[in-house]
């Protein structure tokens, strides 16, 4: 914008702009005045947006210092009122790339603009392949007799829900992803004992993580062989003709089925739509859900227990709401940065927060506790000792010692796994490197001690939540006199909710990332 002053009158000199543009003395030469105006005109061209506001306030036609003209005073009053009630987002609205970054809204059409439809088709194909192996049964087994024993074993019923009914159908993929999960758990524990494994995970970057993943694959094959042998020995009373050839063939088929399922899980992970292991378990639990609720409804209608049925349904929805609330709950610790640029304000941000999940360990403590309580039964099956059989009966779901031992083990594993995922010393060192600090806490050891105290208190809340989640369904069953949660306990619901929320975040992040790729850096008129 170009401002041209033709007559430097005394009236014009009283405005703030022209005090800077025009010298107060009139005895200057016309040549010097023209030079001064030329320089100011050049600077005003470069600042057109700010000069337009200055010109509006310094216009001769609007100059009314005594308020004689009522039209002008009223218009300026309305203009001032509009400015006061204007929101900060409208005042400081970012432009250009900053506006594109802040525009994180997602429309339904954004889903079809990128590669997400193709990824979802691949995901459905992989999940269908994983379910196909469940329906291919092992030969030579009396399935009806086996199912009668399966309904009486609560632990096997729970594992059957994780495999999507694969154990009950005696499918070749009945082991599922469980051997790979066991291998991951073992390597996570070994990483705390052997520093070399910890260096592979943290210091060697992507190459180290790939090498650790390769070790986990090898270990998962070993776990699959051991579990396949255990399953074949468990099926021995139900086999039509238990021979060495049948046992060897069954072990090979079960091992290959587990390896195939693990491969599918890794392919799903590469799609970046969620964790492949979690999505496989999610699919298996969803497939088991109709049968579980079908048995509940048939039992309720046959016994005319309608009050119990309503209690079960209400408890289920309350359980889902409670899980969603706790899964999204965070303990936010404020932190101050020395300096950090943000696109939201277009400047330097000096404060943020450090989020800690209330249930940061997820479902892993419950899985650890369930595996520990199942250990006496597994050993009793191999050894045949009467003492182990007695302990297994007491520690099975419904046993006298099941509930107290389950709560104690959940609390222990939750505390351990919380600090396994978040090392206070490591977090303190990272904050120090980034120039961040917690208010009223010194950097270094004091910060690590503060974070350890916060995590300890959070682990108490998380342990209480997981204990209620593990014991709640059993209490509801005893109150309603229905076995609705048999094989579909709070653990399964926690996995369902956690996997669904994680996949929703991944899909949203993928859509936003696709929008960022389409930003035209020099299309400022669009924003």
Curated annotation (Swiss-Prot):
Subcellular location: Plastid, Chloroplast thylakoid membrane
Membrane topology value: Multi-pass membrane protein
Domain of life assignment: Eukaryota
Gene3D superfamilies xrefs: SecY subunit domain
Stored SUPFAM superfamilies: Preprotein translocase SecY subunit
Function statement: The central subunit of the protein translocation channel SecYE. Consists of two halves formed by TMs 1-5 and 6-10. These two domains form a lateral gate at the front which open onto the bilayer between TMs 2 and 7, and are clamped together by SecE at the back. The channel is closed by both a pore ring composed of hydrophobic SecY resides and a short helix (helix 2A) on the extracellular side of the membrane which forms a plug.
NCBIfam families for the chain: 3a0501s007 (TIGR00967)
Protein name as it appears in the record: Preprotein translocase subunit SECY, chloroplastic
Organism: Pisum sativum
Organism placement in taxonomy: Eukaryota, Viridiplantae, Streptophyta, Embryophyta, Tracheophyta
